[in-house]
Amino acid sequence: MGRFAQGKFTVKNPAKYIGNKVPTYRSSWEFTFMKFCDEHTSVSQWASEAVQIPYRNPITGKHTIYVPDFFIAYGDKNGKQRVELIEVKPLNQTVQEKVGKNKHNQVHWVINQAKWEAARAWCKQKGIFFRIVTEGDLFHNGRRR
């Protein structure tokens, strides 16, 4: 089994980082997204694992908490200020057809759907957006964006 890149991210632009704790990346993709948030001029604020959203786990039936990977505020290409919650996931965990017949993967897909439905509802109440970022968003032609 492969190991994921994990560690503490060193923020270069502390005025932009609004989280209460040192950002921790749990994959190289999260590291890439942190670097993007920290360095991109359009991103005005960002935080790692800063929001807690209650949801019901559809497998256990228990109420629990979902913590999306990122909160970001940025100016879009039209100059409009946007605020989003971001979850970084591999594409094969976001599309049911790509999950396959593996029971473990199917359970995670069902749980993720419940988390993301709760996140969309929470964001709608706050007037912000929820987005899932995959490798297609992070990388272009096999290179980091």
Set out the residue ranges of the language-model regions.
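Electrostatic, structured charged patches in enzyme active sites and in nucleic-acid/phosphate-binding
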Residues: 1-145
